[in-house]
Each structure stands twice: as C-alpha cells, then as structure tokens.
C-alpha cells in the first residue's frame, strides 16, 4: 500500500502541474478524479503513510516564470469536487448535522483563471494569479487592461477581491479566426486563451483580446454576513457579478438548478464546467473552516465531459524525459469540443490492459480538461475480431530492452544515453518553468543533439555562434537571440536550475522549498534525506531522491561545470529568518488599522517571520486587532488566543 500511495502521489502531482501550470493536462478530469479518490481512500485507511507532497494536502499549481512572484495575503484554496447527486447529499448531511439552519448559494463555476485583486484606499494596487495558492504571479498591468475591473472603487477600502477571468465564446471565436488568418496555431479552448492572454508580456494584446471577469469573494473586510450579500456588495462596488445563482436551504432545489444549468450551458455566452455550492451564512463558513486544501463549506459539482466515438487506426509509442514510454492512438478524425481530433492518449500499458484496448477498436474519446484528447473506453458492441494490442519490448528510440517495474503502471527505458530521453531532458531544462531559454525548443534540441553539439545540460553553455550556424535552418539573427537567452539564464535563481535538472519527485515547488532552506545547490551535495524531510512541504521520498542524485559523482561534476560556465548556483529569493520575533507564528489581522494599511501590516508581519492567515482557528497563535474588529476578534477571545493592537506591531 505504501508503494501505491507514493505512486499515486507522484502521478497526481505530475497531472496537477500539467493542468494548473502548463494549462495542458495529459489525462482527463475523470481519470484524475478516479486516481485522486483512490489516494484519498488509501490515506484514510493508512494515515501513517500520508506524504507531505500528497495532492490531498496541497492547493493549486506551481509558479511560472516571466512575471514577478506575488505572496498572497490570504491563501487561495481549491474546492472539493462532486460528480453525483449522492456526493452532494453527503455534503448536505455533513453541513446540516452541525448547522440545521444552513442555507446554500449555488453559483456557476466559470471555466477561466482564478485572479486576486488587492485594493488599498480604494485603488487597485495588485492583480495576481492563484499560482500554488500561496505564491502567484503579479500580473497587475495585464489586469488593468481588462475593461470590467474597476481601477478605483467608490469607497477608500483596503480589500482583496477574488474571482475568475475568462474569455467569452465570441471573443474566442474572433481571436482564433485572426490567428488562422495569420498562420498562427489556434487556442484549444477559451480557458487556454484566457490563461495565455493573462501571461502576455505585451499589455496591448491583453486589451485587444477582450477578457472579462466574474468576481465572487471579498477578503479582509467584515461588511457582509452572507455570500449572497457579498455578491450584492461587489456589484455595488462596480465589479461584474454573475447573476445566475440560487439561494435555498434545500439540496433538492440546488440539484434542480444544477440540472437546469447543465441543460442550457451551451446557450451561455461563456463556458462553465460546473456549479459551486457554498454555505451562504459567513458565520457558519467561519465555524466550518478549512482543510489544508479546501474550505469545508463549499463543494464544486463538475459536469461530465463531451464524448465521441472514433476508431483506432494505429498506435505510436514515445519516450519521455524520465524514460516512461507513452502510447498514443491515431484515430479516424472526429469533431470534439470544437476541434478535429485525430490522436488521443492511451496513458500507459496498464491502462491498455485494464480497458483491453485494441487496434481497430471503436472507442469513446473525450478531452481531458477540455484540452487533451484521451480514450475513455472500448465500444464492445462494435468489436470485430481484432487481436490484442502488441506491446513493445524494445525502446522505440534506442532499441534497449524496456522494463515494467512491479510498482509502476508504465513501460520504462532505463538507458541513460537513450536519444529521446536525453533530448526530452534538455527540452525540460530549457522550458519556461525551469531555465526559461527562449528558442531552445524541441526542433532546435533535436538538431543540436543530432549534430553532436549537446549531450547534457552543461553542453548548452558551451555553444558558440559558429556551432549554431552549422545547423540547418538556423540564421545568424536567431542564433544570436538563442545565445543571448542562454546567457540570460545563467542569472536565474537556483531553484530554476534544480527543477531543470529533472530529478525524480523534485518539482518546482519542492525546488523552491529546498533552496529556501539551504540557499545554494552546492550545499545539497552534503545533505541527508532525513534533514530534507524536516522541511515543511517535503517528505522522505523527495529527500531520498535528491540525495541519491547528488551522491552520484557526475552530479558534483555537473555542478562544477555549470559554475565554471557562469551559471548561478545560489537562491536569490528571500529566505526565512529563524531569529525573527514572530518566526513560526500563525497570525490573523482584523479590524481597521489607523497607521498602516493592510498590505503594509501583512508585509511587516511576514518580515518578522509570521504566517498570516485570513481566519481564526485553534491553530492561530496571535490576532492583531484594529478598531471595529468583528467576529474574528470575538472568536479569538473565545478561544483564548493572544490579542495585540497596531501600536504593539509598530513597536516590534
């Protein structure tokens, strides 16, 4: 069971990164949810085996490059998902058993990108993406180019507003028509288009693409006593608020509303993927609180994905950077979710065996997250006399013997010199989330590798203009740009480099946590797995994987070569000061401050080592209360939590 929990944790973390960070999931929502539920059940049965990097303990995605990081004043949580009436009923029973008077507000789940807007004295100061729920991207200039977001409020408020940025169906159609005319690749769906737009560095493009928003949450003020009144207040302040919602104490009414919305969703001018059900009374929300991942007072009902039938014509097998061999089905073309689909992932050999998928089968295809086509099941009634799927025994790239480890679902090539494995590793190193070397994509990597110019990541920093000009299709101007991008990457903070090395289990978030703790990549040559496991957010498996990598002689040699080439090995971000006055304390701000605005107060608390949260609980160590403090102060007094005022904070 321990191995299965580790395997599920790794798989789900990979899929989370694909969905939240790259906006390109490789598995369907339903496949992800099936694996997630299996993990939840195993963790409930074997709680001692819960890993610190388990997706059940995490929120959202990791940070991308290209924009400054932004530390959220209050975490942005994910939502618990539901896929059936029974799950909604279970949610209802859990809530009503503790709070019989609870009402629900059902709101549309907009298929967009979560945003957070910070206002100081009524002026928009920061617009940010969710990121991993704690650290997002500062996209303020792009946010200011969304027409329906107020730049200044009618009241001088210090407040954070949360919601979704999206692209309407009409705007999506227009932009894809323009891209088609210009010979550019079309966006797969409006969510992808919205995500790509918000990450544009040219703000004129953002303004042109006509993004819109729906806002639904107010954080940091205590001016409303219900979710419905919060929506009304947001509308009064000038925000766009979705008018399709239902208030009821009956889950029967909520279910009728969900069914009605699902039946008419295609008539809406924007895309939705479900309905969010929230406890309406904010006082009850406060009492229910949060798990590490999601609020206990809300649940998201997800609509099933669109499905179509297609025939499998053939199967391609490709090798990834970790050696995993992935099967992809070539299909008879079919229209699915607005695009023509002719290829779909088959995930792995265990999935093929479990579904008994064969070449020539008619299969049901759907889009994972409305993006990546995947095979869901075989239409047994249409099967003829097809033979079972031939499974390769040799690597399609290097012809080495493939292995299928007992605790894994995939075939794997374990030849470290496999051309596909090496090339995918180089592509990963150059990717946006890693070293962000613009121009070093798959086509250029293949040319460099085939020419014998690069075999590992250190070779990238040995490339010269003369080397690049020997390659087909590489002109002097593009070669100079690539060399400039390589040179620029040398100055990256070391967590980008650590992630780019592609060490198993070491994702972008783990890389940041490790470098925050140790400060320098060379320090990792002497750490132990047990020491690494003490870092909050990591586990022993991550520690063991990192130590195993850096114990190799070639790892020390690689670091030496990178350092000699001028690549930065130090962490450039802010590291926690364990001697700070409030280090390790969980602090809540409430009420109106006279001398500091809320952002200044939060920054001061964080500089003093505190973790600032938005709600009072038994885990809260300290409450800093201003004038007109409301329910948070009362709850802190009830729980016997230490309470201080603004002057106390200023004097620290």
Curated annotation (Swiss-Prot):
<feature type="domain" description="BRCT">
    <location>
        <begin position="577"/>
        <end position="652"/>
    </location>
</feature>
<feature type="binding site">
    <location>
        <position position="107"/>
    </location>
    <ligand>
        <name>NAD(+)</name>
    </ligand>
</feature>
<feature type="binding site">
    <location>
        <begin position="29"/>
        <end position="33"/>
    </location>
    <ligand>
        <name>NAD(+)</name>
    </ligand>
</feature>
<dbReference type="InterPro" id="IPR012340">
    <property type="entry name" value="NA-bd_OB-fold"/>
</dbReference>
<protein>
    <recommendedName>
        <fullName>DNA ligase</fullName>
        <ecNumber>6.5.1.2</ecNumber>
    </recommendedName>
</protein>
<feature type="binding site">
    <location>
        <position position="398"/>
    </location>
    <ligand>
        <name>Zn(2+)</name>
    </ligand>
</feature>
<feature type="binding site">
    <location>
        <position position="130"/>
    </location>
    <ligand>
        <name>NAD(+)</name>
    </ligand>
</feature>
<dbReference type="Pfam" id="PF14520">
    <property type="entry name" value="HHH_5"/>
</dbReference>
<dbReference type="InterPro" id="IPR001357">
    <property type="entry name" value="BRCT_dom"/>
</dbReference>
<dbReference type="InterPro" id="IPR018239">
    <property type="entry name" value="DNA_ligase_AS"/>
</dbReference>
<feature type="binding site">
    <location>
        <begin position="78"/>
        <end position="79"/>
    </location>
    <ligand>
        <name>NAD(+)</name>
    </ligand>
</feature>
<dbReference type="InterPro" id="IPR013839">
    <property type="entry name" value="DNAligase_adenylation"/>
</dbReference>
<dbReference type="InterPro" id="IPR036420">
    <property type="entry name" value="BRCT_dom_sf"/>
</dbReference>
<dbReference type="Pfam" id="PF12826">
    <property type="entry name" value="HHH_2"/>
</dbReference>
<comment type="similarity">
    <text>Belongs to the NAD-dependent DNA ligase family. LigA subfamily.</text>
</comment>
<dbReference type="Pfam" id="PF03119">
    <property type="entry name" value="DNA_ligase_ZBD"/>
</dbReference>
<feature type="active site" description="N6-AMP-lysine intermediate">
    <location>
        <position position="109"/>
    </location>
</feature>
<dbReference type="GO" id="GO:0003677">
    <property type="term" value="F:DNA binding"/>
</dbReference>
<dbReference type="GO" id="GO:0003911">
    <property type="term" value="F:DNA ligase (NAD+) activity"/>
</dbReference>
<dbReference type="Pfam" id="PF03120">
    <property type="entry name" value="DNA_ligase_OB"/>
</dbReference>
<dbReference type="InterPro" id="IPR001679">
    <property type="entry name" value="DNA_ligase"/>
</dbReference>
<dbReference type="InterPro" id="IPR013840">
    <property type="entry name" value="DNAligase_N"/>
</dbReference>
<dbReference type="InterPro" id="IPR033136">
    <property type="entry name" value="DNA_ligase_CS"/>
</dbReference>
<keyword id="KW-0234">DNA repair</keyword>
<keyword id="KW-0235">DNA replication</keyword>
<dbReference type="InterPro" id="IPR041663">
    <property type="entry name" value="DisA/LigA_HHH"/>
</dbReference>
<feature type="binding site">
    <location>
        <position position="302"/>
    </location>
    <ligand>
        <name>NAD(+)</name>
    </ligand>
</feature>
<dbReference type="InterPro" id="IPR010994">
    <property type="entry name" value="RuvA_2-like"/>
</dbReference>
<keyword id="KW-0464">Manganese</keyword>
<keyword id="KW-0479">Metal-binding</keyword>
<keyword id="KW-0227">DNA damage</keyword>
<dbReference type="InterPro" id="IPR004149">
    <property type="entry name" value="Znf_DNAligase_C4"/>
</dbReference>
<keyword id="KW-0862">Zinc</keyword>
<dbReference type="GO" id="GO:0006260">
    <property type="term" value="P:DNA replication"/>
</dbReference>
<keyword id="KW-0436">Ligase</keyword>
<dbReference type="InterPro" id="IPR004150">
    <property type="entry name" value="NAD_DNA_ligase_OB"/>
</dbReference>
<dbReference type="GO" id="GO:0046872">
    <property type="term" value="F:metal ion binding"/>
</dbReference>
<feature type="binding site">
    <location>
        <position position="164"/>
    </location>
    <ligand>
        <name>NAD(+)</name>
    </ligand>
</feature>
<feature type="binding site">
    <location>
        <position position="278"/>
    </location>
    <ligand>
        <name>NAD(+)</name>
    </ligand>
</feature>
<dbReference type="InterPro" id="IPR003583">
    <property type="entry name" value="Hlx-hairpin-Hlx_DNA-bd_motif"/>
</dbReference>
<feature type="binding site">
    <location>
        <position position="395"/>
    </location>
    <ligand>
        <name>Zn(2+)</name>
    </ligand>
</feature>
<keyword id="KW-0520">NAD</keyword>
């Amino acid at each position: 069971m321990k191995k299965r929990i580790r395997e599920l944790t790794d798989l789900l973390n990979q899929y989370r990164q694909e969905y939240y960070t790259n906006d390109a999931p490789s598995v369907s929502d339903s496949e992800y949810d099936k694996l997630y539920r299996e993990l939840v059940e195993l963790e409930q049965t074997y709680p001692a085996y819960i890993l610190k990097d388990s997706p059940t303990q995490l929120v959202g995605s990791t940070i991308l490059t290209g924009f400054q990081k932004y530390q959220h004043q209050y975490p942005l949580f994910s939502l618990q998902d539901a896929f059936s009436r029974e799950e909604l009923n279970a949610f209802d029973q859990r809530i009503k058993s503790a709070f019989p008077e609870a009402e629900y507000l059902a709101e549309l789940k907009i298929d967009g990108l979560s945003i957070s807007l910070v206002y100081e004295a009524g002026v928009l100061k920061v617009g940010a993406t969710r990121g991993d729920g704690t650290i997002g991207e500062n996209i303020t200039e792009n946010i200011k180019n969304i027409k329906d977001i107020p730049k200044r409020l009618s009241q001088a408020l210090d407040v954070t507003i949360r919601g979704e940025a999206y692209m309407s169906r009409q705007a999506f159609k227009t932009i894809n028509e323009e891209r088609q005319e210009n010979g550019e690749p079309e966006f797969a769906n409006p969510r992808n288009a919205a995500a790509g737009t918000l990450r544009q560095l040219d703000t004129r493009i953002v303004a042109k693409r006509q993004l819109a928003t729906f806002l639904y949450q107010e954080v940091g003020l205590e001016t409303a006593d219900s979710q419905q009144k919060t929506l009304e207040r947001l509308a009064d302040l000038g925000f766009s608020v979705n008018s399709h919602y239902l208030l009821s104490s009956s889950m029967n009414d909520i279910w009728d509303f969900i069914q009605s919305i699902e039946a008419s969703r295609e008539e809406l001018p924007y895309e939705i993927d479900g309905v969010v059900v929230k406890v309406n009374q904010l006082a009850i929300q406060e009492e229910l609180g949060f798990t590490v991942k999601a609020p206990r007072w809300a649940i998201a009902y997800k609509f099933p994905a669109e499905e179509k039938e297609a025939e499998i014509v053939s199967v391609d097998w490709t090798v990834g950077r970790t050696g995993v061999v992935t099967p992809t089905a070539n299909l008879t073309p079919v229209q699915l979710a607005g695009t023509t689909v002719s290829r779909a992932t088959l995930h792995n050999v265990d999935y093929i065996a479990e579904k008994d998928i064969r070449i020539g089968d008619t299969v049901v295809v759907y889009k994972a997250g409305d993006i990546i086509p995947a095979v869901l099941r075989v239409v047994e009634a249409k099967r003829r006399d097809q033979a079972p799927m031939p499974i390769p025994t040799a690597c399609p790239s290097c012809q080495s013997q493939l292995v299928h480890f007992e605790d894994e679902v995939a075939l794997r090539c374990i030849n470290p010199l496999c051309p596909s494995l090496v090339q995918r590793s180089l592509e990963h190193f150059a990717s946006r989330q890693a070293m962000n070397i613009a121009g070093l994509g798959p086509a250029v990597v293949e040319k460099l590798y085939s020419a014998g110019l690069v075999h590992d990541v250190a070779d990238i920093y040995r490339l010269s203009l003369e080397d690049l000009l020997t390659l087909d299709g590489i002109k002097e101007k593009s070669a100079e740009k690539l060399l400039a991008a390589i040179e620029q990457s040398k100055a990256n903070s070391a967590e980008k480099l650590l992630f780019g090395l592609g060490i198993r289990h070491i994702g972008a978030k783990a890389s940041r946590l490790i470098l925050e703790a140790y400060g320098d990549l060379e320090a990792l040559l002497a750490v132990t797995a047990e020491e690494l496991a003490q870092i909050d957010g990591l586990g022993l498996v991550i520690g063991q994987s990192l130590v195993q990598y850096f114990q190799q002689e070639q790892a020390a040699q690689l670091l030496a070569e990178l350092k000699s080439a001028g690549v930065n090995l130090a962490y450039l971000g802010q590291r926690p000061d364990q001697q700070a006055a409030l280090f390790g304390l969980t602090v809540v701000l409430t009420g109106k401050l006279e001398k500091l605005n809320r952002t200044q107060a939060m920054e001061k608390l964080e500089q003093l080592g505190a973790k600032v949260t938005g709600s009072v609980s038994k885990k809260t160590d300290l409450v800093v209360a201003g004038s007109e403090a409301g329910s948070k102060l009362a709850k802190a007094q009830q729980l016997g939590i230490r309470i201080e005022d603004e002057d106390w904070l200023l004097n620290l």
